Amino acid sequence: MKNISITNRKIEHVEICLYENVEFGSTLFEDVTLIHQSLPGFSLADVSTTTNFLGKKMSAPIIITGMTGGLPELGKINETIAEVIEELGLGMGVGSQRIAIEKKETKETFSIVRKKAPNSPIIANLGAPQFVKGYSLEQVEEAIQMIEADAIAIHFNSAQEVFQPEGEPNYSIEILYKLIDISKSLKVPIIIKESGSGLSMEVTKMFYENGIKYFDTSGTGGTSWVSVEMYRGLRRNNWKAESAKLFLDWGIPTAASIVEVRSIAQDGTIIGSGGVRNGLEVAKAIALGADIGGFALPALKAAVKGKESLMNFLKKVIFELKVAMFLSGNKTIGELKKTPIVIGKELRNWLDSRGINLSYYDSVRKRRV
């Protein structure tokens, strides 16, 4: 299985995400309720969703998180996303740039993003396992320069690597030390990003206490990359595929992950992603502790249909976010971060089991600016 090229794998990943059922688990956003305010005190037109992220102003706290690149057809997806987020004033990340570092001829499928979105927050992307295999500051800077990125996400996908037919699940502590060292030499921040299994308090603490303050939760309830590798394994009669079925919903629900990360990274910046599917869930993520809402799969499905499809999807999300803010009496994103919320039983039990005091956490989330 080692001879499967990165290029073939990237195509297969996108194809499976588009045509197979890859969503498993719960985000637990159903356990987060915003309080309805019958008299908001202002009109819907007064609601402002503007925010700042990575030093740039955004029309709404929404990014399309890293998905793909590396082939002309995948570069076209990146190009479509970039054009739309530039027009709407949003942000985006690219998929893993390892392929462009190892195959220079594929760089254009990533660099097109900055050409089409000169003013938007753009996030570069490399995989954590590569830092065990020799990646260093040089490769990180190359990925950043390739797209003139405002930050670089280092994605952690241990659950996916375990079940990937050609996976290399090596997550030694060397990764932590390398990233801490690299972060001190960069002009842009590192974002610690999960890949569908959620970030825990423990992992957040490792990085936050060493100066890394940006996190992307990517919790359960959205795309299960274990399921993606299960489908790939089934096609190859790989023995791991049957075991993968036990772990399809493995991980931390997105809502719980947001709280776990915020409870540690109290002045950090958090992208709440993983199963976020609409503007109401963006509002819930931000009220709960995130700064930005992140989308991947629904944006991919819209983008492959063309620019208009993605534009319509994101306009709908922004409208839903505004409605949620209006009905909960919040005129700005700053107010939304402090709005009253009710936590349901399952999420409350999770947080209790993890030793997170809800009264104390409520004061933490409301201190955000």
UniProtKB/Swiss-Prot annotation:
Substrate binds at R9, K10, S96, Q97, R98, Q160. FMN binds at T65, G66, M67, T68, S96, N125, K193, S218, T223, G275, V276, R277, A296, L297. The keyword tRNA-binding does not apply. GO terms for biological process: isoprenoid biosynthetic process. It is found in: Cytoplasm. The keyword Isomerase applies. GO terms for molecular function: FMN binding; isopentenyl-diphosphate delta-isomerase activity; magnesium ion binding; NADPH binding; oxidoreductase activity. Its cofactor is FMN; NADPH; Mg(2+). Keywords: Cytoplasm, Flavoprotein, FMN, Isomerase, Isoprene biosynthesis, Magnesium, Metal-binding, NADP. It is an enzyme of class 5 (isomerase). Pfam families: FMN_dh (PF01070). Mg(2+) binds at E161. One of its GO terms (cellular component) is cytoplasm. Belongs to the IPP isomerase type 2 family. Involved in the biosynthesis of isoprenoids. Catalyzes the 1,3-allylic rearrangement of the homoallylic substrate isopentenyl (IPP) to its allylic isomer, dimethylallyl diphosphate (DMAPP). This is Isopentenyl-diphosphate delta-isomerase. It comes from Sulfurisphaera tokodaii (strain DSM 16993 / JCM 10545 / NBRC 100140 / 7). The lineage of its organism: Archaea, Thermoproteota, Thermoprotei, Sulfolobales, Sulfolobaceae.
